[in-house]
Amino acid sequence: MASGENQSSSDNQQRRWHHIRKLLERSGPFCHPDFEPSPEILDFIMDSCKVLIVGAGGLGCELLKDLALMGFKKLHVVDMDTIELSNLNRQFLFRKNDIGLSKAKCAVEFVNKRVPGCEAVAHHCPIQDLDEGFYRQFHIVVCGLDSIVARRWLNGMLMSLLQYNDDRSLDQSSVIPLVDGGTEGLPEHCIEYVKVIQWAKENPWGNNTALDGDDPQHVAWVFEKAQDRAVKHGISNVTYRLTQGVLKNIIPAVASTNAAIAACCATEVFKLASSCCANMNNYMVMNMADGVYTYTFNAEKRPDCVACSNSTRIVEIEPDATLQMIYDKLCEDPVFMMKSPGITTVINGRNKTLYMSSIKSIEERTRDNLKKKITDLGLYNGVDILVADVTTPNTITIKLKFLENQDVEMAR
């Protein structure tokens, strides 16, 4: 009897991977040039390939489910957040009893139980708390974050792990591909927030009245509140018709959009891990506002990119400018887009902190420097300033160039 059960289990496993094996064990016109069909590729995906999923929210739940069902067993999930009531309508791995618990831990526990053989591991912490050694162990990183700051930091971390040969060529073995997915600016989010959160708190008809998507007064109230929230967060296209559709579950756009984007990301992870098909080059947009529209294009790299360029970053500034002007430029300039930069320099061989907001005592001590002219602080044409920010794990060196001295060779 036991032998028969084992045979049945083995047969089920073979059938489970039957269609994936067709992709991995035979060639085709869209395969990567380095692809060699082999049954060992599936063994690598299942037993060796380590994938880090950053974020366990709407996208992260879908990614974890998709990758586990694709055969990836060595999955790690990192998320610092806990589960809230408003998450339950689109983050399907969570239940009402999970409210207040770790997203990463609950998601991993759910998938490990439902997908045989999955060995997912949860990390309930900020991504900044994990060191280089942690990130270096993964073959691929895929993220579903709603924070631009966190996405930029993660990109910077993976860039910092790159190694170079003696001839300054990139060591390809040090490259950890990043598949970056995101959904943002959806008007449905505003409606769902009012439906799940604000209705319970501000229901003008009393706590005993249930929200009715067929009641024009209820729909109008939700529509008005959703519009207010949309204006506050710079989101458009909240309409009465859309409000009614979301309330009656006719338009499950948030959940379906997350599922579609996660499926695209998971497919890219599979392609990177197996080389069974050329990977995307390199950016895809999906717009589901009016039907479904997708567009894939090659996003060009800036030659002076702050994250990956080896060129010296130069900031042009008036010599009578204040440190506040440099601070504002670092925050507002599209090249940098920093959040709270800390600025230091080296003067006469000694480190000097000009301004740093991340540490309260130093911020209080250096706050007055923001009002001072940069020349009064010892900065000169051609000087290097060192800038640290939450958007990058590394310090960035920037050379100041005084505008009135454009024809004068900068000091070295």
Region spans (language model):
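Adenine nucleotide-associated cytosolic modules
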Residues: 1-412
